[in-house]
């Protein structure tokens, strides 16, 4: 056993200078690529981190849709179900009078707290809830894809099939693809009833974003049962289920509703010619996002908007 002095005198570490040069080049590239990154904490290599790191946005279509409602009178409140590390709230939440975030994953919740403080200040008034909403009060196991913190889901009571849950994150071998945590779930109807009764004034107009990987129906039904008739909302939510019954969804709400799918119209060319796309882009071609009203026979998979 060496003593401390012997260890100090014997210490030596060598490295490959070629590897050092490669690393320095990568660091320069990283600094260049991330010069417009969002001022938030994200996890390197995670599926939800690429856009915030590279150009400071997350889901541009969703953020712009929320902004469109916020700047046109729907700015009284924002409810963010499945807030994760706070990307939607932090990048689209400025301008709402009240913000309520819900995130059951305790690991992610700590990052959410930090990102909210970075964005809204230490003395922020954003309400952060370290629990999710479902069909009752319980402790459930959260399944977390190792390469996508944003894809975590509750298997118990999930409305998605196992194939959908695997496919949405491109999981081929589930045996080593996930981590697991026990999380707190509270009854959707009870909690939302209290929220709309005591914390959101009557007559308010706001935005609700739901990204809870197969638990959306529980929250949507609870909103329908508890939303005051004087309030109006734009509900943005994700759907991976091709058999999603939006007619049943509309029946939850005892009032007029309209359902849309957010669709991307990118710049295209014949035969997917990349050079032609570059030329068109240099000449000013622009891609677009638009809302298409959903009919009975249309594919409901994608980012949806329910106007109530």
Locate each region found by the language model.
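Conserved S-adenosyl-L-methionine
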Residues: 82, 209-213
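Conserved residues in the N-terminal Rossmann fold of short-chain dehydrogenase/reductase
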Residues: 130-131, 182-185, 209
């Amino acid at each position: 056993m060496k003593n401390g002095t012997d260890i100090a005198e014997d210490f030596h570490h060598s490295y490959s200078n070629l590897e050092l040069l490669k690393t320095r080049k990568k660091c320069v590239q990283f600094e260049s690529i991330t010069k417009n990154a969002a001022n938030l904490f994200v996890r390197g290599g995670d599926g939800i981190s690429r856009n915030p790191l590279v150009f400071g946005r997350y889901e541009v279509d969703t953020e712009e849709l929320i902004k469109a409602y916020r700047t046109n009178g729907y700015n009284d409140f924002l409810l963010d179900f499945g807030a994760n590390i706070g990307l939607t709230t932090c990048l689209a939440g400025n301008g709402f009078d009240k913000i309520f975030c819900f995130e059951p994953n305790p690991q992610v919740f700590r990052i959410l707290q930090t990102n909210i403080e970075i964005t809204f200040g230490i003395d922020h008034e954003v309400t952060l809830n370290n629990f999710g909403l479902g069909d009752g009060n319980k402790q459930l196991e959260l399944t977390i894809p190792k390469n996508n913190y944003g894809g975590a889901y509750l298997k118990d009571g999930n409305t998605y099939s196992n194939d959908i849950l695997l496919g949405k994150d491109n999981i081929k071998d589930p045996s080593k693809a996930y981590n697991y945590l026990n999380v707190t779930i509270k009854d959707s109807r009870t909690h939302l009833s209290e929220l709309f009764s005591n914390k959101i004034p009557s007559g308010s107009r706001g935005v609700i974003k739901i990204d809870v990987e197969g638990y959306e129906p529980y929250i949507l039904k609870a909103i329908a049962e508890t939303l005051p008739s004087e309030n109006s909302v734009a509900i943005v939510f994700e759907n991976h289920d091709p058999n999603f019954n939006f007619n049943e969804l509309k029946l939850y709400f005892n009032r007029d509703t309209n359902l849309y799918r957010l669709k991307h119209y990118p710049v295209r060319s014949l035969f997917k010619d990349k050079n032609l796309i570059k030329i068109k882009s240099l000449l000013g071609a622009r891609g677009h996002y638009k809302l298409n009203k959903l009919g009975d026979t249309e594919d409901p998979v994608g980012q949806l908007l329910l106007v109530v």
